[in-house]
Amino acid sequence: MDSNFHYSIDLNEDQNHHEQPFFYPLGSSSSLHHHHHHHHHQVPSNSSSSSSSISSLSSYLPFLINSQEDQHVAYNNTYHADHLHLSQPLKAKMFVANGGSSACDHMVPKKETRLKLTIRKKDHEDQPHPLHQNPTKPDSDSDKWLMSPKMRLIKKTITNNKQLIDQTNNNNHKESDHYPLNHKTNFDEDHHEDLNFKNVLTRKTTAATTENRYNTINENGYSNNNGVIRVCSDCNTTKTPLWRSGPRGPKSLCNACGIRQRKARRAAMAAAAAAGDQEVAVAPRVQQLPLKKKLQNKKKRSNGGEKYNHSPPMVAKAKKCKIKEEEEKEMEAETVAGDSEISKSTTSSNSSISSNKFCFDDLTIMLSKSSAYQQVFPQDEKEAAVLLMALSYGMVHG
């Protein structure tokens, strides 16, 4: 079975020449010539490069190519060089010569395969690549032949995007011409000035409100919201930070008058307390009455003076013991004199006067000699009474 190969050669050396495909079968020259007449294609006589390429290809492929599908080889002169692109892998079987002889055995392939070769050449070498041309210019025939619909869509999108970018750049340049560079800084400065002005106004308003509030407080009294004007009953003032209670009721005195009157009340109470203590201490020594009247007066003072007695309990006990001692002395004087009341009064008066003049030792000797005193009080109570008498004597005459 013969194997046919499809070669397509495109030579653009001259403008009058067009693409002409060529088909060459692999094998002898007769089969190649027969296949050439079968497809009715002719090779230009003035194209030396095409004939040389065909002869080189025919001499370069001394083997058969087997594949399950048709193979397409595109030979393009895009970067001023010929490149061979194979779309699918090829399976080949080499024919090995027997003993280096010129004759070779021909093997029949299982399936007919074709190989297509396309050769294109630029008119001018210095012509730029069609993809690098200006997108604003209209597309040429070569661009249309090379580009697929997808490539045309991509190119159109790129062109539109570039036009939009150029338009925005032009608008930005125009705006920059209308507005100088320092416009932004001037706007920021104006904004800061507005903020500072607002802050100053707020502070002034707050200060005015606070001042009005303080004036209202000072005029109507401290935090007086009822509208009632108070007047001090002592100094007749209406402005005070605090109102105090006075003789005319609560909040009838100003702060200064209330403090002054409170101090005066405390001083009067202290003076009264001191005078009461002094009267209690001096009253038993004011008068010396006869014996019976004196005892009655002392009892009355002791009973009525307990309210004003602020002395410690030891002093009160000493006074009671002293009263009992005087009673015992009177009883002794009655037993010794026993004659008349006159002698009794004289002895009592003499004993009271002598008690003030006697020393402590004489008083103890006198008490020890009295039998009535020893009968009434035991020894320890007697010693306690003597000590209390000594203490009271020192307090009165000290």
From Swiss-Prot:
Keywords from UniProt, A to Z, are: Cytokinin signaling pathway, DNA-binding, Gibberellin signaling pathway, Metal-binding, Nucleus, Transcription, Transcription regulation, Zinc, Zinc-finger
Where does the record place Basic residues bias? Answer: 32-42, 291-302
For this record, an example GO cellular component is: nucleus
Instruction: List, alphabetically, the PANTHER family matched.
Output: GATA TRANSCRIPTION FACTOR 21, GATA TRANSCRIPTION FACTOR 22-RELATED
- Record field: transmembrane: none
For this protein, the record's Gene3D superfamilies field holds: Erythroid Transcription Factor GATA-1, subunit A (3.30.50.10)
Subunit-level organization: Interacts with SNL1. Forms heterodimers with GATA18.
- Determine the domain of life of the protein's source: Eukaryota
Specify residue ranges for compositional bias: Low complexity.
Answer: 343-353
Q: Where is this region: Disordered?
A: 20-51, 122-144, 289-353
Q: Which Gene Ontology molecular function entries are recorded, alphabetically?
A: DNA-binding transcription factor activity; transcription cis-regulatory region binding; zinc ion binding
What is one GO biological process annotated to this record? chloroplast elongation
Output this protein's name.
GATA transcription factor 21
Q: Which family does it belong to?
A: Belongs to the type IV zinc-finger family. Class B subfamily.
